[in-house]
Amino acid sequence: MSKSDVFHLGLTKNDLQGAQLAIVPGDPERVEKIAALMDKPVKLASHREFTSWRAELDGKAVIVCSTGIGGPSTSIAVEELAQLGIRTFLRIGTTGAIQPHINVGDVLVTTASVRLDGASLHFAPMEFPAVADFACTTALVEAAKSIGATTHVGVTASSDTFYPGQERYDTYSGRVVRRFKGSMEEWQAMGVMNYEMESATLLTMCASQGLRAGMVAGVIVNRTQQEIPNAETMKQTESHAVKIVVEAARRLL
């Protein structure tokens, strides 16, 4: 294995070339697509779920690095990128909305997350809020408006699990533990916009350590209507979200 300054990512400080902002999708296959929208994209490393590229915006280096699914792997990516000099993190993902008025194809910008994860507890007690940085949130909202995307801003429920933690019954056992039975209805009543699996860890880590973080997601399904997304809709929604996160990064540099 090549020399690295960190345990998992396979990167050195020299690889970052002074970058202080990272775009962090979950999916490794999304990394190259994001980097391709910027100047001078170059692949840096790929190890397990962590694929990283470097590119430039207005002459400044930006890192794009996948986190994999869920809080534990996200915490590794964020920790090691911070060790290498990253101070601002913009997460991009896809999501399932749980409010009837949110349509497939809309964009959601997260201001804070319901901490349904476990990893964030390793960084701050449950009383500490998983809150996004104001400048990051503002940049994401402005970027979304600049491309004409229908945008909703609010709270996200961030779960360690895709099935029981998001109250899905289409599973092998068909069972959801008592803690999560009826939970989606409660989150809906509180105005929570959506479910995803990484933002609670990301936002808690960053807010508690003096780092900046923001979160944007494209809606690929509304769970009040259906559970399975359409492939073409997913592709279009991802494309919009990618453009938004790159424009937001430009505004934050």
Curated annotation (Swiss-Prot):
One of its GO terms (cellular component) is cytosol. The keyword Nuclease does not apply. It catalyses: uridine + phosphate = alpha-D-ribose 1-phosphate + uracil. Its EC number is 2.4.2.3. GO terms for molecular function: uridine phosphorylase activity. InterPro entries: Nucleoside_phosphorylase_CS, Nucleoside_phosphorylase_d, Nucleoside_phosphorylase_sf, Uridine_phosphorylase. Pfam families: PNP_UDP_1. Its main location: cytoplasm. Pathway: Pyrimidine metabolism; UMP biosynthesis via salvage pathway; uracil from uridine (phosphorylase route): step 1/1. It is found in: Cytoplasm. Keywords: Cytoplasm, Glycosyltransferase, Transferase. The keyword GTP-binding does not apply. One of its GO terms (biological process) is nucleotide catabolic process. CDD domains: UP_EcUdp-like. Homohexamer. Catalyzes the reversible phosphorylytic cleavage of uridine to uracil and ribose-1-phosphate. Belongs to the PNP/UDP phosphorylase family. This is Uridine phosphorylase. It comes from Salmonella typhimurium (strain LT2 / SGSC1412 / ATCC 700720). The lineage of its organism: Bacteria, Pseudomonadati, Pseudomonadota, Gammaproteobacteria, Enterobacterales. The gene is udp.
